[in-house]
């Protein structure tokens, strides 16, 4: 027996549509600014942010978990980035099947070049439009939505570099 579908009402449709539109606008702005400030795509930037903030090489499985990506997507992305000289993959000495990935000098140069403009974009198109109360409320609401997922992330979300 199939469960009865609870269709979206007008308010819910509008809310979902707004969420999708905002997500699209944010990604488009980030992609556009990455193209002008660096030679990185948004996925490359996300990978490099995570790797550049790690204390050494990162297991491929841990990278997939941190990015909330399928392992095959991470593998393909790392392969492309290896060909571009942005990262390097090494075998895990304890486990012949496992692999580590780390940034190269070129990858670090690209992330350092892209990070300032990326942070300015995140502020301009998202954070600066909210006051402190808005940010706290949005963080509360997003945590409420995120709590419904099986989140295996063990680190902070990638995509926004921290100033070290």
PLM features: residue spans?
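Charged, amphipathic alpha-helical coiled-coil/dimerization segments
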Residues: 3-4, 79-140
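Alpha-helical linker/hinge and terminal dimerization helices associated
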Residues: 22, 26, 30, 67, ...
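Short, locally clustered residues in the helix-turn-helix/winged-helix DNA-binding domain
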Residues: 20, 49-55, 115, 143
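N-terminal leader segment of winged-helix/HTH proteins
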Residues: 1-38, 162-164
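N-terminal helix-turn-helix DNA-binding core of bacterial DNA-binding proteins
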Residues: 24, 28-72, 84, 154-159
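Active-site phosphate/pyrophosphate-handling residues
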Residues: 14, 46, 136
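C-terminal regulatory/oligomerization modules of transcriptional regulators
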Residues: 1-10, 132-164
